[in-house]
Amino acid sequence: MLDVIKEIEAEQIRTDLPSFNVGDTVRIEVRIKEGEKERLQAFEGTVIKRQNGGLRETFTVRRVAYGVGVERTFPLNAPVIAGLKVVRRGKVRRAKLYYLRDRVGKAAKVKEIR
């Protein structure tokens, strides 16, 4: 039974997205449907966590907009994600970057991999 589930999940996993890690700055193109119209909206920020794995994998992106911290959690394999681009590779030593929530200004930056 477990093999059947894994087989079905393997078929549905997206392979068109680039690989990224926690600490990277990513730009996500999100499909937004307003009535009959559909448009793309960009959301750029730092990946602060990746959870689960396989088909149910999610990741959380944090950005500061107009002085207010905004976090959005996206399912990695969801069709609402039209595109994902890694803007900057970050160098971190943690899997979850919750400490960035308490930092302000330059202290909230992640070092870049050279």
Curated annotation (Swiss-Prot):
One of its GO terms (molecular function) is structural constituent of ribosome. It comes from the Bacteria. The keyword Membrane does not apply. Pfam families: Ribosomal_L19. Gene3D superfamilies: 2.30.30.790. InterPro entries: Ribosomal_bL19, Ribosomal_bL19_CS, Ribosomal_bL19_sf, Translation_prot_SH3-like_sf. The keyword Ribonucleoprotein applies. GO terms for cellular component: cytosolic large ribosomal subunit. Keywords: Ribonucleoprotein, Ribosomal protein. SUPFAM superfamilies: Translation proteins SH3-like domain (SSF50104). GO terms for biological process: translation. This protein is located at the 30S-50S ribosomal subunit interface and may play a role in the structure and function of the aminoacyl-tRNA binding site. PANTHER family: LARGE RIBOSOMAL SUBUNIT PROTEIN BL19M (PTHR15680:SF9), RIBOSOMAL PROTEIN L19 (PTHR15680). Belongs to the bacterial ribosomal protein bL19 family. This is Large ribosomal subunit protein bL19.
